[in-house]
């Protein structure tokens, strides 16, 4: 995760510099060529483990069992809803090109730098979590971090200064990292070993569906009411729906693992 976040900081900033210096087509070409190293690494990999036992479960039956378990385990279901709603309504990242050009008035390089904000916040939050060790009262911290994510997104939509926008975007990344760590750990702790893969599959529906559908929602709202309104309303709805989840799922709100989680 740390390597991925560092790459997310360096990549957009470097892309912004390259686009400003050379033709954007060459930037895409360089990106395509870079995948050659990944393909080569995959070709060089050799698996030396034992052959896995054949899976005798039926696909649809296994999926239904995973959905049934996830829904009946109310704490896990609450984390799924938080994940989906936050990513569905807070799709500020897709608006960055317009925000960079029309709101904070920076060029291509400024856009690339602004794109690194969430990753910088994620790295800082990850370092703090690692330094502090155990997180207590995980349910409260989870709900608070998602609410902070929504508030940061809301004010990001109102900001017109580049540095303030960057700070708020970084704050949203930090809050998202804290909530992601807690959500993921809670799910693993509460899921039996034989259902963990199916629960993860259900989680991927929420994890992948929220951002993709959210981009469509944000685009429709932005086209009708403008980009700032789309971002602000998304952040506000995230905060309100987090409050609803806190009220609707008291067990999630009160959740605390016996020894804390990291």
Task: Pin down the residues of each PLM region.
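Alpha-helical transmembrane-bundle signature of multi-pass membrane transport and export proteins
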Residues: 1-262
């Amino acid at each position: 995760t740390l390597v991925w976040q560092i790459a997310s900081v360096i990549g957009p900033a470097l892309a912004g510099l390259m686009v400003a210096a050379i033709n954007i087509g060459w930037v895409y070409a360089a990106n395509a060529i870079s995948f050659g190293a990944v393909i080569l690494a995959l070709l060089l990999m050799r698996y030396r483990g034992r052959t896995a036992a054949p899976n005798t479960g039926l696909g649809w039956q296994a999926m239904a069992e995973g959905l049934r378990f996830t829904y009946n385990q109310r704490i896990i279901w609450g984390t799924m809803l938080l994940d989906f709603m936050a990513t569905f309504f807070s799709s500020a990242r897709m608006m960055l090109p317009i925000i960079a050009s029309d709101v904070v008035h920076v060029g291509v390089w400024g856009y690339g730098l602004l794109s690194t904000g969430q990753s910088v916040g994620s790295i800082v939050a990850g370092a703090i979590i690692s330094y502090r060790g155990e997180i207590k009262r995980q349910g409260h911290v989870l709900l608070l971090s998602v609410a902070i994510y929504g508030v940061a997104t809301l004010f990001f939509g109102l900001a017109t200064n580049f540095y303030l926008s960057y700070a708020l975007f970084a704050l949203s990344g930090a809050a998202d990292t804290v909530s992601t760590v807690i959500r993921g750990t809670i799910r693993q702790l509460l899921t039996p070993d034989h259902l963990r893969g199916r629960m993860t599959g259900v989680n991927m529906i929420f994890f992948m569906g929220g951002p993709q559908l959210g981009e469509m929602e944000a685009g429709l709202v932005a086209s009708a009411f403008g980009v700032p309104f789309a971002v602000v309303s998304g952040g506000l709805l995230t905060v309100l729906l987090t409050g609803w989840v806190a009220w609707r799922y008291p067990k999630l709100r009160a959740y605390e693992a016996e020894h804390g989680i990291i």
